Swiss-Prot record:
This is Uncharacterized hydrolase SAB2455. Keywords: Hydrolase. It is an enzyme of class 3 (hydrolase). It comes from the Bacteria.
């Protein structure tokens, strides 16, 4: 893996291919390896970069998180993630780059576009579970508060079951999300990673400061992506609302919420049709 030293962290990332830079931002998984099957499909067309977000995988913190980062309304980590991606983009290319964020990674991508538009050539938001600008935002904020409370008091299994039911996660995705790692060490790491995401991201990222105006300013750069196998899920509803209010196009892409690993060939074909 490659390393970029930043304030407070050593950011590690996979890099394959040549030509224009395309950065993938992972969601709850946090690590870029989940994009490697997709990267193999695209490496002849892009320099594909798949990031381990700080606090995840091989990326290392060199300074501790501030105590406030676990507060439900803290924007520290999502803003720091966005800054990391912007600094990575600048280190890799003198030109604006392509960016795709999936799930909570798409929320990070939104903040990249909002705060660092100069690094973005084109950007895609794949099934973003953000609620800030929705008419029923308070309802979804309360639901996420309840889910995190349940995870922290009743355990991860019960809380994630509620999470899946509340967001209407598709069976193809629920099966993959509940699949344990192959080794005991892997299972321990998986548990720690999911608990960290639960405490530091479910509430903070989904209710972070993004508005519809942040999209309309740069609508020519944005594509919304919805999976063909995750119909009627909450993240798809978010994209439908953005589309209705701004006219930014939605493109159907193979697979579910984890389509990039479920159907990487078809996923890549759509990206190449968009950006190739």
């Amino acid at each position: 893996m490659e390393t970029l030293e930043l304030q407070g962290a050593k950011l590690r990332y996979h890099q394959v291919g040549q030509r224009p830079v395309l950065i993938f931002i992972p969601g709850a998984n946090g690590t870029g390896d989940i994009f490697l099957p997709l990267a193999e499909q695209l490496k002849d067309h892009f320099t594909v970069v798949a990031v381990d977000r700080r606090d995840y995988g091989e990326s290392e913190l060199t300074e501790p998180l501030p105590d406030s980062a676990s507060n439900p309304d803290s924007d520290y980590r999502v803003k720091r993630d966005a800054q990391d991606i912007a600094e990575l983009a600048k280190s890799l290319s003198d030109e604006p780059v392509y960016i795709l964020g999936s799930s909570s990674g798409s929320i990070v991508a939104m903040h990249v576009l909002k705060d660092y538009p100069e690094v973005v050539k084109k950007i895609a938001f794949h099934e973003p579970p953000i609620n800030t600008f929705l008419p029923d935002s308070t309802y979804w904020k309360d639901k996420n508060d309840d889910i995190v409370h349940q995870i922290l008091t009743e355990g991860l299994e019960k809380g994630m079951k509620t999470f899946g039911e509340t967001l209407n996660i598709a069976p193809i995705d629920a099966k993959m999300m509940s699949q344990p790692a192959d080794t005991e060490k892997g299972r321990i790491e998986q548990y720690k990673r999911t608990m960290f995401w639960s405490e530091f991201e479910i509430r903070q990222y989904t209710h972070s400061d993004i508005t519809l105006d942040d999209f309309t300013k740069y609508s020519d750069k944005i594509t919304l992506l919805n999976g063909t196998d995750s119909r009627d899920s909450f993240p798809q509803d978010v994209n439908f609302y953005i589309n209705k209010e701004t006219g930014i196009p939605i493109v159907d892409i193979p697979g579910g919420h984890l389509g990039y690993i479920q159907k990487p060939e078809g996923f890549a074909d759509v990206l190449l049709n968009m950006w190739g």
